[in-house]
Amino acid sequence: QDSYAYTEAEATGSIGLPSQTPETFAPLQPIRMAKKHVYLLLGGIESWDGWATSAGMFGLQSSLAVLPDVEVTTYEWASFKKVLDDIALLPKDDIVIVIGYSGGGAKATWVANGYFGGSYPKDALPRPRIDLMILYDPSPTWSMMPIQDNVKRAICYRNITPLFFGLGGGVLVGNNTQIDTIDIFEHHWLVQMDSTLHQRTIKEVKNVQRLGDGYAAQ
């Protein structure tokens, strides 16, 4: 007589459990958070003197350095090629912020164009991705270069009355990028000490997001 009674052996024998290995319980790798890298270019007549003549920017440097996941590196404006080299070494997901005062502001536009001298664009390096650029009264006006879509967003504190022997008053222009121009009216020397501008800059650094990879880098 056939029997169709349920048996424990039949039930348990029909289920195959996956073998467990040490890898099964391996800890998950921590997710790396994108870091914000601020490249701060000082002013100065001869570049090297910017450590003294741009002292007001060191207050901004200190305020930015204490923000979470923010790293600040400061350069003389003549070292702008080093900024290009340092940006090229970053992890692709990190956030790039370039800030420049006076001559450092003008040279920041060179950084954005991959330009370091010679014939442009023939001798230029590939344009770096820049998520945020902030220029404090860039100078001289004739040294400014238009920026392109590799810069996600830029802010220029344009000085209408720099009163500094023809220096200051640089205007930032560009193609296929967002530029916010904030007009100011103060002596060129005092711009670096303007706490209102610094507070705005700090807020922008806190809020900046990464530029996507769809820009036409050249």
Annotate each predicted stretch with a short phrase.
Residues 5-16, 22-94, 187:
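Active-site catalytic motif of lipid deacylating hydrolases and related acyltransferases
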Residues 19-23, 136-139:
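Short amphipathic alpha-helical surface micro-motifs
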Residues 38, 64, 84-171:
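Serine-dependent carboxylesterase/thioesterase catalytic core
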Residues 42-46, 54-58, 144-218:
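Lipolytic serine-hydrolase domain surface
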Residues 56, 60, 79, 83, ...:
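Stable alpha-helical elements in mature extracytoplasmic
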Residues 60-68, 87, 115, 119, ...:
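Hydrophobic, Leu/Ile/Phe/Ala-enriched alpha-helical segments that form helix-helix packing faces
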Residues 70-77, 120-125, 213-217:
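Surface-exposed patches in mature extracellular/periplasmic domains of secreted proteins
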